[in-house]
From Swiss-Prot:
Catalyzes the formation of S-adenosylmethionine (AdoMet) from methionine and ATP. The overall synthetic reaction is composed of two sequential steps, AdoMet formation and the subsequent tripolyphosphate hydrolysis which occurs prior to release of AdoMet from the enzyme. PANTHER family: S-ADENOSYLMETHIONINE SYNTHETASE (PTHR11964). This is S-adenosylmethionine synthase. Belongs to the AdoMet synthase family. Homotetramer; dimer of dimers.
Amino acid sequence: MKKEKRLFTSESVSEGHPDKVADQISDAILDAILAKDPDGRVACETTVTTGLVLVVGEISTSAYVDIQSVVRKTILEIGYNRPELGFDGNNCAILVDIDEQSSDIADGVNESLETRENQQDKDDLDKIGAGDQGLMFGFAIKETPELMPLPISLAHSLMRRVASLRKEGRLDWLRPDAKAQVTVEYDDENKPKRIDTVVISTQTDATVSNDEIREAMIDMVIKKVIPSQYLDKDTKFLINPSGRFVIGGPKGDSGLTGRKIIVDTYGGYARHGGGAFSGKDLTKVDRSASYAARYVAKNIVAAGLAYQCEIQLAYAIGVAHPVSIMVDTHGTSKVSEDLLVEAVRNVFDLRPAGIIEMLNLKRPIYRQTAAYGHFGRTDVDLPWEHTDKVEALKTYVSEHAE
C-alpha cells in the first residue's frame, strides 16, 4: 500500500473579509469604550452587508462613544472607501441597537459566588466572577519562533503581505477581500518537512489579468513570505482558482462577528472551546481565559518543559476560580503533566480578575487582534505572548519534581 503524506492545512483571511470587517468594528467599539472607561462592560455584535452595518449588543459604561464615527473610521481604514466596492465607509447606512448588560449577569460578575458565600481568598481578586460558563483552550508548539503551528503562521503572514502591498499602492489593482490557505507536509516525527499547497484568493479590480495576478502572488507574496527550504518543484500554487474575483467584501458575502474563530486561534491544529473573542470585554472568559491559556502554554513550551502544550480551562458563571485546569503535552513533556498542572495553579492567577491584572487587559488593544490572529503575533506587542513566567515555572518544577 502506498504511504500517504502527512498533511495539515490552515487558512487565514484578510482584514477586508466581511467576517473580519465585523470583528474589527466590534473590537474598535470595545477599544473606544475602554479608552474612556476601563471597567466598561461590552458585548458588541456586528453584521455587515452591501451598504449596511448593523451593530447590536449589551454595553454598560460611564463613557460616551460615537459608535457611528467609530464604525465609519474602521471601515475606511480597512480600505472600503469608494462606492464601486459596494461597501463604503463614507456613505453606508449604520443601524445601532444597544442595551445595557443584563442585571442578572452583572450581579454574578460583580459579586462572585465565593464572595456571596464568604469563601473568598485574602485578596480582592475573588470578588469578580466569570461572565459565563465555558471551556477555553490555549496552545503552543516549537514549530516557529513565536511557538505557533506552521500552517496558520504562514497563512497569516501571506495575508499581511497581501494587505501591505495593497495599502502601499505597489499592486494598485488589489481590493481588500482575500483568503489564504497553506498545506504543510510533516515527516514521520511530526516535524514540518515542506509546503505541499498554497492557495491565495484575492479580490482585484476588473482590469488585471489572471496571469498577472498569479505572477504577483507567487513572486511578491509567497516567495517573500515562505522560507525557500519549504518550497520545491512539487509545491502547488493555486491562485484565484475560481477565476474572476472582483465582487467581494460585504457586497459579495454578509459578515458577522465571531465567525472566524479557527482563523483567530490555531488554524485547527489545537482544540477550540467554541467562544468567539471580538466585541467582548475581559470579564468574558471566552476571551480573557483563552488569552491566559495561550500565555500558560507558551511559557511552558518556552521553558523547555514540553515540545508542545495544550491547556484547557473551564469556568462557571459567577464563580471566580476555574472549575478545571488540564495540561496535555501530547507525550512531549519532560516532567509529569500532574506536576505541570500543579505548577500552573501556583504560578498563574487564572481567576478572571487575576487574568485581567496579570496581563493588564483593561486597555484599548483589541482592534489590532481582530485581523491576522490573536496569537503568535510578531507585528504587535500583546501581553499574552510574553514569556516572563519561564523562570518561575522552571523553579517550581525543579523544586517539586520527585
